[in-house]
């Protein structure tokens, strides 16, 4: 009997087939889930390696983190929100590995402090230098995580015919206008039927949305690109971009 996955890959294009496989897994097909993870181990290792900047063996802790993250991506993936499973999985894997590295760095710093306590002035100076080095490393890790979020966000924007440059050029200039646009986006995602229109047709349901919000149709249409982008962020697996939303709403 041929493996379930090899049969699935005969159904059509790879992306469509992968989505079918994920749909089956999310309905409880554990055998297929194990096969899919096994097949994509090279992808997982490559993604983890891009973060760690070294060769990754399956015995490495970082690979195990990547494996868990890939499995999480399979369970959380929703094709209606745009972009491919692999793009989504790449974001989740990199984020989880970066979090792991950050925790390991913090643990190493605590050990360093314990070892250096009670030592002379020279040792204290070494400790300060070590702490500064770890802080710089953390900043680099955070910058990498922000960059990965932006790259994934750009891929999602592309599904809606938008670019990051267009978004910057078409963002509302005033804080209150940005706040209103974000509230419109929040209203949209709260209504499943409107969110479904956005996800499937890649268009803003302006007519239906107009009846639910306190801003005019003209305002909705003028801020269409920004509202779509905010919907992507609200419903997406973003950390730093959601902080941006909170910052706008509370400014």
From Swiss-Prot:
Which Pfam families does the UniProt entry name for this protein? Sigma70_r2
Q: Which InterPro entries match?
A: RNA_pol_sigma-70_dom, RNA_pol_sigma-I, RNA_pol_sigma70_r2, RNA_pol_sigma_r2
Indicate where this protein resides in the cell.
Answer: Cytoplasm
- At the top level, the lineage of the source is Bacteria
The record lists its disulfide bonds as none
Give a yes or no for keyword Cytoplasm in this entry.
Answer: yes
| Annotated knockout phenotype | Cells lacking this gene exhibit normal cell morphology and growth rate at 37 degrees Celsius, but cannot grow at high temperature.
Where does the motif Polymerase core binding lie?
A: 61-74
The recorded induction information for this protein reads: Part of the sigI-rsgI operon, which is transiently induced by heat stress. Expression is positively autoregulated via the sigma-I promoter. In exponentially growing cells, expression is regulated by the WalRK two-component system, which represses the sigma-I promoter and activates the sigma-A promoter, leading to the formation of a basal level of SigI. WalRK can also positively and directly regulate transcription of the operon under heat stress through a binding site located upstream of the sigma-I promoter. Repressed by glucose.
Specify whether Transcription is a keyword of the entry. Answer: yes
Q: How is its activity regulated?
A: Negatively regulated by the anti-sigma-I factor RsgI. Upon exposure to heat, SigI is released from RsgI and activated. Transient heat activation of SigI may depend upon DnaK chaperone.
**What does the record give as the function of this protein?**
Sigma factors are initiation factors that promote the attachment of RNA polymerase to specific initiation sites and are then released. This sigma factor is involved in regulation of cell wall metabolism in response to heat stress. Acts by regulating the expression of genes such as bcrC, mreBH and lytE. Also plays a role in survival at low temperatures.
NCBIfam families xref list: PRK08311.1-3 (NF006172), sigma70-ECF (TIGR02937), spore_sigI (TIGR02895)
**Subunit details:** Interacts with RsgI.
What name has this protein been given in UniProt?
Answer: RNA polymerase sigma factor SigI
Q: Which organism is it from?
A: Bacillus subtilis (strain 168)
